[in-house]
């Protein structure tokens, strides 16, 4: 077969660019797993391994991409359709997308291992910056007795007051999950949380035929078992998916400006307009509206300290 002429190559390139610019996603494939060195894409129900043009930069799970097939079961990603609502992580000193085109973030934790509200706050800031809806899921609620449940409710009271949803349930006992499942329906949801809180068990609960999916991914890879160390998308139905991000305990926030971090704490941010200085750090400046609110007890000291810790990290 003869090689394409420069004119033919340019015509093909321009056609692809026009499709991407127009947002014509009818032919788009979906990135369902990123294995670091290789992508797995869903091309209208067919699972394929894929490489990508390095000039495209980093690719995220749930990206809509334009592909060409260089082999019957292998593709090349030629372009990325415009992204909506993207979460990022820091990797090797660079900011890279974790997942794109997402609707909401499910922050998962459990009484064992115990959680830290500071970690929950980091996830909330990431959700705020991505303009996605966050909610909390406290798994292993069967481990609570009346006293420890009351203590947990007290620790989470600030989030209730701020209007965030908090779901309680037990994957092990399959109780308290109906409302949460309804919240997930029809949405693209990233699930996050520290190891041992039951994320994998929850995904297995939501997707009973998960083994079929992982076998399809393994077949596309051509060898071995599907990795659990990289982000991947689990389709629950045609309109619903869970995106797991193993190893990401806290999305990177170091790229955010000080004001962007503060805006992720809305109950604190509302007092910044009372500060004398526009660039107030809310620590030692005179006439600081945030400090006055803190002294009055109008904002949580724990939340304030959490915010200042995130701000300090970005200055290192």
Curated annotation (Swiss-Prot):
The gene is rsgA. It comes from Dichelobacter nodosus (strain VCS1703A). This is Small ribosomal subunit biogenesis GTPase RsgA. Residues 8-18 have a biased composition (Basic residues). Belongs to the TRAFAC class YlqF/YawG GTPase family. RsgA subfamily. It comes from the Bacteria. GO terms for cellular component: cytoplasm. Keywords: Cytoplasm, GTP-binding, Hydrolase, Metal-binding, Nucleotide-binding, Ribosome biogenesis, RNA-binding, rRNA-binding, Zinc. SUPFAM superfamilies: P-loop containing nucleoside triphosphate hydrolases. Binds 1 zinc ion per subunit. Residues 92-251 form the CP-type G domain. Pfam families: RsgA_GTPase. Its cofactor is Zn(2+). Its EC number is 3.6.1.-. It is an enzyme of class 3 (hydrolase). One of several proteins that assist in the late maturation steps of the functional core of the 30S ribosomal subunit. Helps release RbfA from mature subunits. May play a role in the assembly of ribosomal proteins into the subunit. Circularly permuted GTPase that catalyzes slow GTP hydrolysis, GTPase activity is stimulated by the 30S ribosomal subunit. Residues 1-20 are annotated as: Disordered. Monomer. Associates with 30S ribosomal subunit, binds 16S rRNA. Zn(2+) binds at residues 275, 280, 282, 288. Its main location: cytoplasm.
